[in-house]
């Protein structure tokens, strides 16, 4: 008996943000791919002012009270080592990820806020 796409989607819908991030990382490792959005080349030089923003920067503004949990969340989200993640958290406000799509930016923001950090998406 095989699992249907609907069953997989239902299982993912019941997961926490942290569990989804861990699942994505495991899939990237197992299949040798990345979940990063493909960069599309070309387009108008000036762009359209009314065009919706497609790339976002996730900025850690404050570590909050639970600094250890925030460092763990930063490590999980960025793949940084312990020393690098601690340095980034200590230097807040600091950019965590730049040029990510809206879904990834919002997921990262939710994950870090769940750990106790203050996060801004620009």
Curated annotation (Swiss-Prot):
Keyword terms, alphabetized: Ribonucleoprotein, Ribosomal protein
Record-level Gene Ontology MF annotations: mRNA binding; structural constituent of ribosome
InterPro entries, A to Z: Ribosomal_bL12 (IPR000206), Ribosomal_bL12_C (IPR013823), Ribosomal_bL12_C/ClpS-like (IPR014719), Ribosomal_bL12_oligo (IPR008932), Ribosomal_bL12_oligo_N_sf (IPR036235)
Source domain of life: Bacteria
GO cellular component labels: cytosolic large ribosomal subunit
Keyword Flavoprotein attached: no
Gene Ontology biological process terms from the UniProt entry: translation
Listed NCBIfam families: L12 (TIGR00855)
Binding partners and assembly: Homodimer. Part of the ribosomal stalk of the 50S ribosomal subunit. Forms a multimeric L10(L12)X complex, where L10 forms an elongated spine to which 2 to 4 L12 dimers bind in a sequential fashion. Binds GTP-bound translation factors.
Role according to the record: Forms part of the ribosomal stalk which helps the ribosome interact with GTP-bound translation factors. Is thus essential for accurate translation.
HAMAP family: Ribosomal_bL12 (MF_00368)
Protein family according to the UniProt entry: Belongs to the bacterial ribosomal protein bL12 family.
PANTHER family noted in UniProt: 39S RIBOSOMAL PROTEIN L12, LARGE RIBOSOMAL SUBUNIT PROTEIN BL12M
Protein name as annotated: Large ribosomal subunit protein bL12
Organism of derivation: Aliivibrio fischeri (strain ATCC 700601 / ES114)
């Amino acid at each position: 008996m095989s699992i249907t796409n609907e069953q997989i989607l239902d299982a993912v819908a019941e997961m926490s943000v942290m569990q989804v991030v861990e699942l994505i990382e495991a899939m990237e490792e197992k299949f040798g791919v990345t979940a990063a959005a493909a960069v599309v080349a070309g387009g108008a030089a000036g762009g359209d002012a009314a065009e919706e923003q497609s790339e976002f920067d996730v900025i850690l503004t404050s570590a909050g009270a639970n600094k250890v949990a925030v460092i763990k969340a930063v490590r999980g989200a960025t793949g940084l080592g312990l020393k690098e993640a601690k340095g980034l958290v200590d230097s807040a406000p600091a950019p965590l990820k730049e040029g990510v799509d809206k879904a990834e930016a919002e997921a990262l923001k939710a994950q870090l806020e769940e750990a106790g950090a203050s996060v801004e998406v620009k």
